[in-house]
């Protein structure tokens, strides 16, 4: 059985430096917590003064809360009708639900008309998201809209980030903020200075596993 051995102090120094260099990050704690487990990642997020965690699926909300996380949690996997666990969290004001299809907005309004949501916009990844030509006309009245989420491909360019922001800003509620992923810290900061809306960045691998020289495997 392999064990992951960590130089804890150097790893924590990396986390602190990363958080300072990219203010406003939203750490991702999905799955098994990048091999560290949810308990440790919750503890480190609290130490860093983080205000929002991201989990992959609705079932993981209970796990981070079990270890003491009592602030906001965003569920990255887009909501779909029929997910009973996700439906049970819709009226929790500290759980932010991701919406990625126009038809799901209508379905969600029937279940939880004041739910806290992020709206995902389709990018060049073409994985999830509301198509660009549908964004401006989305009816989000009544929801607690926390912002718009832009899942860019790995190594995304600043140009695509700018273009996605332009699309979002066509909506009357664009001022709620834009959440990006996979921008470099420099590009993220540059974009946040250019936009007149709040900007956040989700980050997982680069935060938790970015200091690979401080870890090794032992049998």
Residue ranges and their predicted role:
Residues 2-6, 10, 23-170:
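Active-site-proximal beta-alpha core segment in soluble small-molecule metabolic enzymes
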Residues 18, 82, 132-133, 174, ...:
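General structural signal for secondary-structure boundaries
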Residues 152-214:
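Catalytic alpha/beta core domains of metabolic enzymes, predominantly
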């Amino acid at each position: 059985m392999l064990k992951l051995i960590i130089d804890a102090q150097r790893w924590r120094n990396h986390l602190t430096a990363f958080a300072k260099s990219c203010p406003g990050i939203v750490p991702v704690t999905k799955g098994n917590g990048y091999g560290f487990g949810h308990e440790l990642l919750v503890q480190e997020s609290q130490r860093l003064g983080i205000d929002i965690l991201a989990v992959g699926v609705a079932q993981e909300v209970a796990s981070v809360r079990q270890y003491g996380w009592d602030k906001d949690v965003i569920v990255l996997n887009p909501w779909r009708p029929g997910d009973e666990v996700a439906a049970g969290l819709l009226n929790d004001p500290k759980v932010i639900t991701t919406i990625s299809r126009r038809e799901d907005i209508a379905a969600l309004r029937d279940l939880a008309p004041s739910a806290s949501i992020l709206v995902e916009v389709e990018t060049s990844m073409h994985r999830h998201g509301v198509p660009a030509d549908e964004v401006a006309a989305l009816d989000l009245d009544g929801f607690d809209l926390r912002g718009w989420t832009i899942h860019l491909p790995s190594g995304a360019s600043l140009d695509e980030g700018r273009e996605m922001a332009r699309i979002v800003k066509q909506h009357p509620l664009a001022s709620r903020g834009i959440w990006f992923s996979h921008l470099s810290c420099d590009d993220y900061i540059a974009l946040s200075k250019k936009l007149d809306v709040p900007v956040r960045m989700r980050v997982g691998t680069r935060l938790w596993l970015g200091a690979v020289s401080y870890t090794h495997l032992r049998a």
